[in-house]
Amino acid sequence: MTEESLNPIVYSKNVIEFVTVANEFCNLVEHAGQEATRSFLNKTQKILPLLYLKVSVLEDLNSYEELGLEKFVSEVDYNYLQQKMMNLLGEFDDFQEVFDPGMQFSDEPLSASISECLADIYQDLKDFLMTFRTGDELVMQEALWVCQDNFKNYWGQRLVNSLRAVHNLMYGDYDLDQAMNQERKSEDVEAESNKPEWLNQLFKDQGE
């Protein structure tokens, strides 16, 4: 394929940079639990603003509605990764939500979960990345449009909400270095035993 024949949108500088950052975010989520809570939050604090920036500068696209895109992240995969992050964050996972539409119908403060927000972002980004790897430029462009649309209407708000909570943890008076209690350890071991097979092979050729 010559340089002139490449799709000018899906191979543009902004798209390639977004793909790179999205891949780094997904790697962070997939390896949650392999490092300390503070280290995970420190990396999350840095990559979320970068991810927001990279998707915000993408060119607006048109949708090819007749294209049905495959979903790669199953409910089992989602629950496994969300549980891993919840175990890692422990008592720091929950935070008070201030941008939930349901607040207008509730007299009580609504709570949200960092791990759930990150898992929601991951699900859209991983589906996008896996579709993008097909090399079909029309499908790649549609996947990019879907990812942008979901960002505008859903996971972009989840991103900024979770970033607010992470910022509070990083700079608040919290003992993020405390060891996990026995219950969290037991849950972590159980989650590890149920690790989906696709995680072992998903990026086995990455770096080759």
Could you tell me what each predicted segment is?
Residues 2-4, 9-74:
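N-terminal interaction modules that seed assembly of large macromolecular complexes
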Residues 36-40, 114, 136-140, 144:
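Residue-level recognition of alpha-helical structural elements
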Residues 32, 53-107:
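Long, low-complexity or tandemly repetitive, helically biased scaffold regions used
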Residues 13, 17-24, 43-50, 54, ...:
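Charged, amphipathic alpha-helical oligomerization/scaffolding segments
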